[in-house]
């Protein structure tokens, strides 16, 4: 049944009786009438249209409400940021990350091998640590001078913020080198796999952070595995053990200081690590001279050269160069991947170092010791998953 339409103030009407007389507006823009079939027959059944109610048709031009539709050209001065990666770009990114990881692990394994060779012949970890930082600093200065890499733009505020990070990095670096000079490389890295436990404890009691229950539960295999590996280590040394533990604690504080102080800074990646190495070198040099001194270095150097031969010099150069390269690649990788992926990669790196050092140095290891190492590393993997 068709109902009447209320007209506007200037509308017109047509009465319907028996037959329909229609007055079509001169300019019809819109009609609310339903489409009726058989338009050729202009008569309507009386049962369809009410006899009493007239049908009013009004021109759309008389309606008070109008809709204005306009089109605007997009502002080309501000392009849309649509982050859509094509399949080729995704494949290239995955390949790039894979190359970073493979290079990172390979460089780290080579560094640990040469570092242990140097420390076996030249047991002076303070000088060895200093040479590693000095070599990296020199390499980056040459890269900046020759424009192989763009020099970072820094100011005094940047170096002030970097100072506590450099102090923690220096302590962690020296402590790890002291540990490797006293115990096997594999044992040092097994203990260093317990770094997540230090991270949670420091963040909880010093920074006031809280973590979900799975994070705390993941610490149990880490702590238990490290303890099992320590008590079953055949060549256990308290200095080597404490050096690895101090290194864990120092690197945790380094990460905290870096996260809080360096957030939003323009320097990142390899330039950030280069600046960190230079400041750490300035901090470490006077302490190295005070703890060991040139006289001990000269006597130890002559003894190492007489035992090893000229290859000893190349060992020192190799361990210094590869130390900087593997750290540089790790910082470059962190710019390309998520913290979770980096943490998993770091766990796999530690496994490769432990296995390679056992094979190359023929490190004696008991089954229960290997079980402790496996439990600790597996706990590190669980921690990286639970942290997310």
From Swiss-Prot:
Spell out the protein name for this chain: Glucose-6-phosphate/phosphate translocator 2, chloroplastic
Q: What is the lineage of its organism?
A: Eukaryota, Viridiplantae, Streptophyta, Embryophyta, Tracheophyta
A single Gene Ontology MF term assigned here is:
triose-phosphate transmembrane transporter activity
The family annotation for this protein states: Belongs to the TPT transporter family. GPT (TC 2.A.7.9) subfamily.
PANTHER family from the entry?
SOLUTE CARRIER FAMILY 35
Q: Which UniProt keywords apply?
A: Chloroplast, Membrane, Plastid, Sugar transport, Transit peptide, Transmembrane, Transmembrane helix, Transport
The places in or outside the cell where this protein is found are:
Plastid, Chloroplast membrane
Single GO cellular component term = plant-type vacuole
Topology in the lipid bilayer? Multi-pass membrane protein
Which species does this protein come from?
Arabidopsis thaliana
Its job: Glucose 6-phosphate (Glc6P) transporter. Also transports inorganic phosphate, 3-phosphoglycerate, triose phosphates and, to a leser extent, phosphoenolpyruvate. Responsible for the transport of Glc6P into plastids of heterotrophic tissues where it can be used as a carbon source for starch biosynthesis, as substrate for fatty acid biosynthesis or as substrate for NADPH generation via the oxidative pentose phosphate pathway (OPPP). Required for dynamic acclimation of photosynthesis and partitioning of Glc6P between the chloroplast and the cytosol.
């Amino acid at each position: 049944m068709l109902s009447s339409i209320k007209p506007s103030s200037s509308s017109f009407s047509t009465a319907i009786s028996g037959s329909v007389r229609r007055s079509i507006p001169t300019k019809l823009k819109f009609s609310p009438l339903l489409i009726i079939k058989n338009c050729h027959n202009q008569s309507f059944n009386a049962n369809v249209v009410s006899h009493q109610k007239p049908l009013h048709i009004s021109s759309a031009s008389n309606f008070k409400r109008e809709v204005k539709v306009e089109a605007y050209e997009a502002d080309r001065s501000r392009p849309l940021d649509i982050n859509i990666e094509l399949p080729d770009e995704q494949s290239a990114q995955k390949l790039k990350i894979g190359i970073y990881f493979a290079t990172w692990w390979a460089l780290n394994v080579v560094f640990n091998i040469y570092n242990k060779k140097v420390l076996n012949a030249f047991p002076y970890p303070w000088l060895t640590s200093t040479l590693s930082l000095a070599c990296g600093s020199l390499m980056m200065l040459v890269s900046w001078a020759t424009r192989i890499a763009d020099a970072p733009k820094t100011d005094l505020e940047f170096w002030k913020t970097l100072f506590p990070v450099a102090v923690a990095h220096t302590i962690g670096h020296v402590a790890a080198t002291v540990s490797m000079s006293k115990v096997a490389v594999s044992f040092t890295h097994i203990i260093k796999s317990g770094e997540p436990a230090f991270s949670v404890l420091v963040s909880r009691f010093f920074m006031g952070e809280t973590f979900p229950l799975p994070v705390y539960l993941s610490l149990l295999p880490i702590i238990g595995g490290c303890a099992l590996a320590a008590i079953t280590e055949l060549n256990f040394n308290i200095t080597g053990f404490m050096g690895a533990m101090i290194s864990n604690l120092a690197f945790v504080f380094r990460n905290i200081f870096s996260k809080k102080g360096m957030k939003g800074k323009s320097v990142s990646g390899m330039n950030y690590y280069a600046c960190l190495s230079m400041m750490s070198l300035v901090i470490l040099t006077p302490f190295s001279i005070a703890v060991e001194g040139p006289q001990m270095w000269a006597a130890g150097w002559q003894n190492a050269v007489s035992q090893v031969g000229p290859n000893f010099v190349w060992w020192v150069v190799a361990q210094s160069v590869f130390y900087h390269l593997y750290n540089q690649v790790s910082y470059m990788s962190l710019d390309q991947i998520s913290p979770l992926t980096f943490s998993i990669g770091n766990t796999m790196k530690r496994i490769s170092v432990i296995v390679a050092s056992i094979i190359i140095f023929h490190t004696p290891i008991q089954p229960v010791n290997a079980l402790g190492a496996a439990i600790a590393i597996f706990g590190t993997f669980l921690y990286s998953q639970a942290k997310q």
